[in-house]
Regions:
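Mobile cap/lid helix-loop segments that gate and shape the active-site cleft of serine hydrolases
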Residues: 31, 159-162, 190-229, 235
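Histidine-bearing beta->alpha loop at or near hydrolase active sites
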Residues: 105, 272-279
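Conserved alpha/beta-hydrolase "acid-adjacent" motif
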Residues: 246-255
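Catalytic nucleophile-loop/oxyanion-hole region of alpha/beta-hydrolase
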Residues: 79-82, 98-135, 281-286
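N-terminal cap/lid segment of alpha/beta-hydrolase-fold proteins
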Residues: 18-63
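Primarily recognizes the serine-hydrolase "nucleophile elbow" in alpha/beta-hydrolase
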Residues: 122-194
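Short substrate-entry loop that stabilizes the transition state in hydrolases
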Residues: 62-66, 72-109, 160-162, 189, ...
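Short beta-strand/loop motif that positions the catalytic acidic residue
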Residues: 233, 239-241
Length: 303
């Protein structure tokens, strides 16, 4: 009982305390806590009169403007929320974090969902000064389906047919400089041709993402596969997956690593012993150190 109370006390001491609320840009609410400045509900685009929004978390410590990490939540492309931001802990290490809300597969199929994500990157670059971060070099991260979108952003920079125009700001680039995927699908084409009995069902997440049977949408499922787009100008990527997750998710990481190796690019694959589909192991001391090392190198230019 005493130990439990001590743990609870530590959590309470570390938790951010809300100090003030005010109005911010693009319809947002600005929330000031003891450790963060938060812009909630920043509208980055409107599609058919429906606003798409994101949240921005900034470290409160004074100094140079922080570098930006953009997060995309999971949920099989059909559920989930930007409130589920699994890399918010990076704010305590001096990084700005944006968590993006994108349309789900009941309202938007591929590649429109990716267009939302690219639109968010362009918007964040366009509004970097107003929101208070650096966006010349940007990292993206995501969990599960969100990791798939993050890794697509990393590997489709400059692919015009996948750019879209959501939110405008087409004078800004959607290219990113580092990709982090956590237990994410990377080779949807492989899944579609090896397990059609599973993925051709209307209830499957891949069927709903593509708007039909994957086995009958071969060209589209190739475009939706991260491994289809890897070229020599792609940025480094980090892929984390649990050793106790489904074998196919581990294979996705291995196929991504193999494709990157073949292209002569940097891909770090870590299979975390005993971890499942998510959990605290993905932000433990060892993983946090690795993520920070790659961010410091690729965004801040620190060796």
């Amino acid at each position: 009982m005493i130990l439990a109370r001590l743990v609870l006390l530590c959590l309470l001491v570390q938790a951010p305390v809300v100090e003030a609320l005010e109005r911010g840009p693009e319809g947002s609410i600005v929330e000031q806590t003891t450790v963060e400045k938060i812009y909630r509900g920043v509208v980055f685009a409107e599609v058919d009169d429906i606003p798409l929004s994101l949240d921005v978390y900034l470290p409160k410590k004074k100094g140079s403007r922080p570098h930006l990490v953009v997060f995309f939540h999971g949920g099989s492309w059909r559920s989930g929320s930007k409130e589920s931001c699994q890399v918010r802990w990076l704010v305590r290490h001096g990084y700005a974090v944006a968590s993006v809300g994108y349309r789900k597969s009941h309202a938007a199929k591929f590649p429109v969902i990716l267009h939302d994500c690219k639109g968010a990157i362009r918007f964040l670059r366009a509004r970097a000064d107003a929101l208070g971060f650096q966006a010349e070099r940007v990292a993206v991260a995501g969990a599960s389906a969100g990791g798939h979108l993050a890794l697509l952003l990393a590997t489709t920079g400059g692919v015009e047919e996948l750019e879209g125009s959501v939110g405008g700001h087409l004078e800004y680039s959607s290219r990113v400089q580092l990709g982090l995927g956590m237990y994410s699908p990377t080779d949807l084409h492989h899944d579609a041709i090896t397990a059609p009995d599973r993925w051709d069902k209307p209830a499957s997440s891949l069927f709903q993402l593509l708007g039909g049977k994957p086995s009958e949408k071969v060209a589209l499922v190739r475009k939706a596969s991260v491994t289809s787009h890897i070229t020599s100008d792609d940025p480094p990527v980090l892929f984390l997956v649990g050793g106790a997750d489904q074998p196919q998710r581990i294979e996705h990481g291995k196929r991504l690593k193999a494709a990157y190796d073949k292209a002569g690019l940097q891909a770090v694959l870590q299979i975390i012993p005993g971890a499942g589909h998510g959990g605290p192991e993905f932000r433990d001391e060892q993983r946090a150190a690795l993520i920070l090392e790659m961010l410091d190198k690729e965004l801040a230019g620190r060796p």
